[in-house]
Amino acid sequence: MDGASAKQDGLWESKSSSDVSSCPEASLETVGSLARLPDQQDTAQDASVEVNRGFKEEGSPDRSSQVAICQNGQIPDLQLSLDPTTSPVGPDASTGVDGFHDNLRNSQGTSAEGSVRKEALQSLRLSLPMQETQLCSTASSLPLEKEEQVRLQARKRLEEQLMQYRVKRHRERSSQPATKMKLFSTLDPELMLNPENLPRASTVAVTKEYSFLRTSVPRGPKVGSLGLLAHSKEKKNSKSSKIRSLADYRTEDPSDSGGLGSTADAVGSSLKQSRSSTSVVSEVSPSSETDNRVESASMTGDSVSEADGNESDSSSHSSLSARGACGVLGNVGMPGTAYMVDGQEISAEALGQFPSIKDVLQAAAAQHQDQNQEANGEVRSRRDSICSSVSMESSLAEPQDELLQILKDKRRLEGQVEALSLEASQALQEKAELQAQLAALSTRLQAQVEHSHSSQQKQDSLSSEVDTLKQSCWDLGRAMTDLQSMLEAKNASLASSNNDLQVAEEQYQRLMAKVEDMQRNILSKDNTVHDLRQQMTALQSQLQQVQLERTTLTSKLQASQAEITSLQHARQWYQQQLTLAQEARVRLQGEMAHIQVGQMTQAGLLEHLKLENVSLSHQLTETQHRSIKEKERIAVQLQSIEADMLDQEAAFVQIREAKTMVEEDLQRRLEEFEGEREQLQKVADAAASLEQQLEQVKLTLFQRDQQLAALQQEHLDVIKQLTSTQEALQAKGQSLDDLHTRYDELQARLEELQREADSREDAIHFLQNEKIVLEVALQSAKSDKEELDRGARRLEEDTEETSGLLEQLRQDLAVKSNQVEHLQQETATLRKQMQKVKEQFVQQKVMVEAYRRDATSKDQLINELKATKKRLDSEMKELRQELIKLQGEKKTVEVEHSRLQKDMSLVHQQMAELEGHLQSVQKERDEMEIHLQSLKFDKEQMIALTEANETLKKQIEELQQEAKKAITEQKQKMKRLGSDLTSAQKEMKTKHKAYENAVSILSRRLQEALASKEATDAELNQLRAQSTGGSSDPVLHEKIRALEVELQNVGQSKILLEKELQEVITMTSQELEESREKVLELEDELQESRGFRRKIKRLEESNKKLALELEHERGKLTGLGQSNAALREHNSILETALAKREADLVQLNLQVQAVLQRKEEEDRQMKQLVQALQVSLEKEKMEVNSLKEQMAAARIEAGHNRRHFKAATLELSEVKKELQAKEHLVQTLQAEVDELQIQDGKHSQEIAQFQTELAEARTQLQLLQKKLDEQMSQQPTGSQEMEDLKWELDQKEREIQSLKQQLDLTEQQGKKELEGTQQTLQTIKSELEMVQEDLSETQKDKFMLQAKVSELKNNMKTLLQQNQQLKLDLRRGAAKKKEPKGESNSSSPATPIKIPDCPVPASLLEELLRPPPAVSKEPLKNLNNCLQQLKQEMDSLQRQMEEHTITVHESLSSWAQVEAAPAEHAHPRGDTKLHNQNSVPRDGLGQ
């Protein structure tokens, strides 16, 4: 099969480019040797029906034939010549095919394109899942569910294209100005059913956008497998018309007309070739007109079966296999062609010869089996095609119904949208008119606002005058309180300065007592130093004698031992060097061994890694070779399979792509519907939000009413508090008057002032609390006012919006119904109400602004008071913090200075040690760096190798994964192929079993016939033998004759039976042909019914259009109804809201009037307050006079204090002089003590050397004694000399012991003296610390006094300025109020406003405020000078005491060194104790 198909492919390729007229001759030459069978005629008939279906669905013979025939590509440029008179399909087909084309031609004028293109789109939708080959392979077809999925995908793609086009059109419309009356929708059914309007319909655009669909995969029924022939009457261009994309379905005007001529043209159109190795080709030569007729009928049948969606390949394949078998039997069983008997060819040689029974039975059985198989195959194929068409129609009906419902919903929604858009345009017009009206109203409002501003300016000028009066009153009260506080601060500072003077005198007395004690201690120390010097002179004389004796002894020993000691030192040095070198060598050897072990391990690791690399590379190469071999083997195995599967896969890919296109189109449509629904929901949400905003405005109005009521209550509370304060102030004024009259003397006045100050402090606290309450109330009032302003603005905006909306609604409803007129009247009334509301709001704003100005003036006064108080507090806090910081920093700096000196000495020692250590470390580092470089090189190699290993491992893993993937894919392919092969094998087995059963039945019958024949032959032979043996018997002759007669009868009966068999066969064949003709007639009827179905579909489509338009109109109606209902509801809500607002505005007007009345009352009360404050001012001025007298008394006391300070400073200067003289004495003593310490150190060193030399002398004496003993044994004459020497040595030892005892005594005395000096030093330190603390306290007091003086000066300056401002303000107020004096006197109480003079004389204030001269007699300046002198004197004392402590510390250290030397000589283990004892006083001094 494959070889034949390949040869035929080559033939068709060679013929594809040749002219059409040469095709029939070539086909006759190639096909002339083959015989045509009836089943091949059926295939031709099926193909012709497919052609007719192509005409009916596509409307263009060229395109339909290309779609129907071009898929297999096996018969290029072949054309059928069918006679219309002889064809049985001709008259019937004219109603379907020719009638359709006639209708097409008639309707081409105006509506041809629309109807044809609608039909083209519908046929496109139906033919998308039916374009694939039916006879490609033996595998079973896709189930019906997959067919539906394919159709859905194709639809989705089409809908996606429509969506894209709609988006483009929508953009173009948005850029261009849209006409008003044009009804246009993005979901237009005409646009959907007219694909020429789409940009995708053009071949250029589609080839650009759908170039990925250009594949060489065939579609449609494979005509070559049906055994079609082509005969040409007309010539057509032979360009390829493979359907690559949706653009190729574009309809064209039909150029030809006629019954079967169009079918011939369709079959004869150019065909494209495809490489399908499994396609079946059967070429048949045209024998007669009946053959052509039957061939055309078979073509139509097969094409109808395939167009109906029959995708079962097995049935058609089985029918073809049966036909092929029949053709082979016919050719084999008939060698010569001389005569034709009932369709069978009989040679001339076989006329007189009858075949045997076996041959006849075999031929009959084979022919019967072939006929049964053909009938079964054809019936099965037609049954499958009809069932598949029915199922496909049912499956298509469901999504079409869904689509229709979706389209209806879409049209209804479009109608609603159009209605809403019309309403929106009208609303925009109304909005523009309303905006113009608003502009006119705004101009009127501006004029009214200007008028109100002029009135407000007048009110502001009056209120500013009131504010200035209030501010002046507040400033006067503040100045009086400040003066009182300053007087109290001055009194306190004077008392503190008196206390400080007393403390300073006490400290002076203490210091004098301490100085006397110091003088006594110094005298005692001088006496002890004198005694020590005498003792040291005696000790020095004794030491000189001992040194002379020692030199005589050492001179003798040095000569003998010098050489020995030098040699010993050299030997020791060499030994030390040796040990050091050995230790270094051992250390280096250990390090080298460790490094070598590391190198060995690294080398081992390197070798191991190299081996792993080699093994991995071998494994890689082996796996690569294996994978390559396996791939080659699998490729060789699968090449044939892949070649077979490529076409199927490509076809499936195209089906999937079409499916995805349809799915995407559906999704986009659904998204459009959802977007439209969302827009409608947004409109509904906007309406709901407007309603909610109205409700919120109502709530805010209600809340503001409540807030206004609360404000009124708070205002009443504030008025009550103000009245109470006025009463308290009057009571205080009366009490002050009583106090002025009672007290005349200064002491009594002071007591009264203190009491009044206490009472005033309480009043100030009370007033401060009241101020806080007022501030809180004012802040709340401010916030409420801001909220009211915001609410008013929002109300204005809401009113403007509502007025605009009402006017829009009025105009819409005026156009549509009489109800709108009623609404217009209501909106006019609402406008008037809104204007009233606006006017009321303007009045409210004016009142609120006036109230706000009053509140701001009060706030400013309160804020200024707070700011001054906070500023003074913050300055005091900052000064205190700076003092504390300075003292802490001074202490920390002193501690750090001492610590740094200690650290410096330690660091110098450590640096010397580190330099020596660094040199040794640098040498070792150089050696280690050299070694490290080698190790680094090895490590880099290791890292590179490990990375290479990792990369190789990754490559191996990737290759293994790829191999596994390839193996799994190949396994899956093999499984698929195995399943296909098993299904094919099962079918072949079933056919083989049926064939074997038939052959076994026939073989049994043949065996029975042969057995009977052999039996008869045996009987005949016996009879012949008997006849030859006994020819004389007449009886036998008679029997033989009878048998011969019977034989002749049997032969005749056999001939008759054979004739009957032939008649039966011819009858069955005639019946088969009749049944086929009936089937063809039924198929023609089916085609006619399908034509009727198409007409019904057209009518249904028109019904759909009408239904969509109906839904559109219904949507418009529903939209209008919804908008009307919403307008009515909105209108009712607005009416209720306006009624509520009117009521609220009436209430607000009443409240505003009440607020105005209250404000007038408040202004009257404020005037009364101002008058009361003026009275209190006069009283305060009287109090200021009394304060001045107190200031004079304070100055007298300051003069007394100055005198005391001067006396104290003189006494301190004398004490300083005495201290300086004593410090000089102490310095001289310290110098002498230092010299003594140096000498003691030298003596101690000499004693230590002497002790070492004595030890050496003793050892040498022992050696000499040994030598003398030996010499005495040899020379007894030298014994007397030795005894003399011994006696001398004993005497020297006794002298040394006496010297040691004397040294011990001197050490004990030195210890006692040191302890005494340490105690005196500690007492001096404690006294110095006390003096320093006293100095710090005096410094603090000085700073406090300076700060207080500066504050007093500043306060006096501010008082003067305030008094001057008050005078000016009061004079101006008096000048302004001369004219309306009568009115003010009638309204205000009887107390007139007077401008009293400043109680403090100006000359005195100027003297106070002037900066002090160079030599002034003011008490503060003298105090400052005294404090500075005291500070300088205390600093000098502190320095002297520090120098004294340093000298004492140095003398003690020198004494300790002097005592340490003899102590070491006498007690070698007692050094630690002495050292510890000496270290204690040093630490104490250092501290």
Swiss-Prot record:
Q: Where is the composition biased (Low complexity)?
A: 269-288, 312-321, 365-375
The domain comment in this protein's record states:
Extended rod-like protein with coiled-coil domains.
Q: Where is the composition biased (Basic and acidic residues)?
A: 785-796, 1372-1382, 1462-1474
The main location is cytoplasm
Q: How is it modified after translation?
A: Cleaved by caspases in apoptotic cells.
According to the record, the residues making up region (Disordered) are 1-118, 221-321, 365-394, 785-804, 1372-1396, 1458-1487
Q: Name the membrane topology term.
A: Peripheral membrane protein
Question: Where is the stretch described as Golgi-targeting domain?
Answer: 172-257
Residues of the region (Interaction with GOPC) are: 121-141
Q: What is this protein called?
A: Golgin subfamily A member 3
Tell me which residues bear Phosphoserine.
S18, S60, S270, S381, S385, S461, S979, S1387, S1479
Please give the InterPro entries that the UniProt record associates with this protein.
MT-Golgi_org_protein
Q: Which residues carry this modification: N-acetylmethionine?
A: M1
Reported tissue expression: Highly expressed in testis. Transcripts can be found in spermatids during spermatogenesis. No expression in Leydig cells, spermatogonia or spermatocytes. Detected at low levels in all tissues.
